[in-house]
Amino acid sequence: PEARAARWVTLLKAQAQLARGDAAGAAASLKSLTADASRPVMLMSADLALAGAAGPGGELALKRSAEDLQTRVAAKPGDVLAWSLLASTWAKLGQPLRSLRAEGEAQYAMGDLRGAIDRLRAGQRLAQGGGATDFIESSVIDSRLRDLQAQQRALAAEERESR
């Protein structure tokens, strides 16, 4: 029990430091929990990576955070906060297509089907606009968009029948 309480105190301290703009202090506080693979530590680490607390190794910290978050949402697709942090992380890493998909999944996890479809359509438009495109991510977006549009049509049909 004491170790768990100490962990929470450390997390709260790091969160307060980050909120005050002391990213370096928050990173130092969180160092004692580096072996902890729990969701709260992972999310705080993602916040720190986004705040640039890693200094010169910032991109490496962001990539590690993206990997951890991607693993998390694959196992728990309803984790809105993890999807949102993943979207921000991909955006900061210069991966707008992946960021839009993660935004769409975050909207879906919140129950906002229209918002999810909107974000995925934005991803489709971006992919069709040319430039360096991640074809795998583009295919995932296309497939996911079809799934969500089918859900939307089913809900609309259900609504019409209930009138």
Say what each PLM segment does.
Residues 1-31, 61:
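Extracytoplasmic and endomembrane cell-envelope/extracellular-matrix remodeling and assembly machinery
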Residues 16, 48, 89, 106, ...:
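TPR/TPR-like alpha-solenoid repeats
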Residues 19-25, 53-62, 92-101, 132, ...:
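Alpha-helical linker/edge segments of TPR/alpha-solenoid repeat scaffolds
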Residues 27-31, 62, 66-70, 103, ...:
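Inward-facing hydrophobic residues that define packing positions of alpha-helical scaffold repeats
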Residues 109-163:
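Terminal, low-structured helical/coil segments at or just beyond the last alpha-helical repeat
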